[in-house]
Amino acid sequence: MSPRNRFLALAALALTGSLALTGCEGLDDLPDPARSDDAAPAPGGSALEAAEGLTVKGRAPKTGYERGEFGSAWIDTDRNGCGTRDDILADQLDDVSRDDDGCKVLSGVLDPDPYTGTRITFERGRSKVDIDHLVALSDAWQKGAQKWSDGKRRAFANDPLNLVAADSSTNRSKGEGDTATWLPPNKAYRCEYVAGQVSVKKKYELWVTRAEQDAMREVLAGCPEQKLPSGGNPTEAPTR
């Protein structure tokens, strides 16, 4: 055996003995950094800290924006057979009734409406309930979405993480507003609302303006324990 090979053999023997002395049974007991359950970050996290970490830039021009840039409205991105709007209504309303195909929500109750804190009855065709994008599509367009793939824009427009059933007139008063220009009248919901916007912007790597980040800080400073919501759909919608 060459001197080099003799050295390697002795080193391996020493390592084995060291593991035995420390109570380890072998290298298989050491954590594998490639395993997702070892490397995954802890769930939750502070919404305020996440807001601090968002990229800050100026708002880009709205040139080229139209609703169709984010795909047809309320497509079935999760492939459960139902459109996104009906999925959100079924998930966020109480006392839901559906048609015979099991998808279309015919009636229900939004209690409370997060934006106003009131009780709203939903009836299909005479609805006072909208499905709002927490981060408006046009706001996203001006803060990074112009450069996305079509699939990513479809995913964003239909991601449950970015969608909330809310009073229609209040939602329409929001328009394209971000945190700096609009907050829900229901002050009890503002921390959750802003945390939702932060989560969506973090997930989709959208930037914020300085005024927007300052407004996020101001709201979340009043609820520093507010957790960052997570989940929703993948950030690339399947091809249709």
Please identify what each model-predicted range represents.
Residues A12-G17:
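Hydrophobic helical h-region of N-terminal Sec-dependent signal peptides
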Residues E25-D28:
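Bacterial signal peptide processing site
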Residues D32-E69:
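N-terminal low-complexity, Pro/Thr/Ser-rich intrinsically disordered segments
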